[in-house]
From Swiss-Prot:
This is Ribonuclease 3. One of its GO terms (molecular function) is metal ion binding. GO terms for biological process: mRNA processing; regulation of gene expression; rRNA processing; tRNA processing. PROSITE patterns: DS_RBD, RNASE_3_1, RNASE_3_2. Belongs to the ribonuclease III family. It comes from Allorhizobium ampelinum (strain ATCC BAA-846 / DSM 112012 / S4) (Agrobacterium vitis (strain S4)). GO terms for cellular component: cytoplasm. The gene is rnc.
Length: 239
């Protein structure tokens, strides 16, 4: 397989502008955005960087939570940390940055399932964090993380449990039934899909969630139903 083309100078500038960091070693940005389906036999891709970025992200978020939520217990901090470093949150950051426009992939990426497409977007964010860390150190990586995670950490719903788990337990306790999720619509290209999912519980009015992955849309639908039924307090933070 031929090595994928490097990002153009214009593409690099667009990515650097939105992330708020300008790379010293431009090749690090290229490596961070190269999916395994596009790599040459001995080339580098973001999977190794993702391994490192996952650890850097966890440290930066844990440190931030420790400083901000001084009265929180270890268990409460862990719930927030797990949510903030989850694939869903990382993928949401990727969507905010619109990294899907710049990830270099091969034809095989079209065969990925919806869940794996979410993981692709999540992993590339972690690889980007690692690339910044290797390029300029922990302070630069921390600045990037805080730019995109600090507000998320402060949201009212940041310490919530997983919405689907919460909804399932509530439905079992109140109605002795299991929530049913259905994909009502899928639109958009393979690299940037949009899913509309409905969730039904017995005779209750269904709720709908829309997101760029089936999994995230299910979470959105579950969240809306929990808030509508008063199980959760509606978050006043904007998404």
């Amino acid at each position: 397989m031929k090595a994928p083309k490097a990002l153009t100078a214009e593409e690099r500038e667009k990515v650097e502008a939105v992330i708020g960091y300008h790379f010293i070693g431009k090749e690090r940005l290229d490596k961070a955005l190269t999916h395994s389906s596009a790599r040459p036999a001995k080339g580098s891709d973001y999977e190794r960087l993702e391994f490192l970025g996952d650890r850097v992200l966890g440290l930066c978020v844990a440190e931030h939570l420790f400083k901000v939520f001084r009265a929180a217990t270890e268990g409460e901090l862990s719930v927030r940390l797990n949510q903030l470093v989850s694939a869903e949150t990382c993928a949401a950051v990727a969507d905010e940055i619109q990294l899907h426009r710049y990830i270099r992939t091969g034809a095989d990426v079209k065969k990925l399932t919806d869940k794996n497409m979410l993981n692709v977007r999540a992993d590339v964010v972690e690889s980007l964090i690692a690339a910044i860390y290797l390029d300029a150190g922990l302070e630069a990586a921390r600045a990037f993380v805080l730019k995109f995670w600090a507000e998320r950490a402060s949201r009212q719903d940041a310490g919530r449990r997983d919405a689907k788990t919460e909804l399932q337990e509530w439905a079992h306790a109140k109605f002795a039934v299991t929530p049913v999720y259905r994909v009502a619509d899928r639109s958009g290209p393979d690299h940037d899909p949009s899913f509309t999912v409905t969730v039904e519980i017995g005779k209750l009015e269904p709720e709908t969630g829309i997101d760029r992955s089936k999994r995230a849309a299910e979470q959105a639908a579950a969240t809306r139903l929990l808030e509508r039924e008063g199980v959760w307090t509606r978050s006043t933070a904007s998404d």
